């Protein structure tokens, strides 16, 4: 029970110190009247009413899109498809080259190994049918 009193008292004193300190005054929002022009700030944030109504009129769900907008979206889609196709083709070519090189190396290793085995087991009789005795 005593430790809760200590915690509560320390938090209350900290809160009291922070409310009356000068550091908090500088961090608080100022109430002076010489703040920036509110109309200028609103002008940067909001657009005129006519532009906003035109924007929503053109962008509503039911309004048809313009032909040029459709064409532009189609061009963007086609160019993205072309880039994806080229990238996939490049990746496929690189993989095919890698597989071909690996296959060639594997064939070379197995051929060398077969030649070594053949040389090791050769007993001087060359026609092949003499090998099996």
Curated annotation (Swiss-Prot):
Protein name according to UniProt: Unique cartilage matrix-associated protein
Signal peptide coordinates: 1-26
Propeptide: 27-62
Coiled coil spans: 88-121
Protein location: Secreted, Extracellular space, Extracellular matrix
Organism in which the protein naturally occurs: Dicentrarchus labrax
Changes after translation: Proteolytically cleaved by a furin-like convertase to generate a persistent C-terminal fragment found in almost the entire cartilage matrix, and affecting osteoblast differentiation.
InterPro entries xrefs: UCMA
Modified residues (4-carboxyglutamate): 69, 73, 82, 86, 89-90, 94, 96, 100-102, 105, 108, 112, 115, 119
Stretches for region Disordered: 57-116
UniProt superkingdom: Eukaryota
Biased composition (Basic and acidic residues): 67-95, 106-116
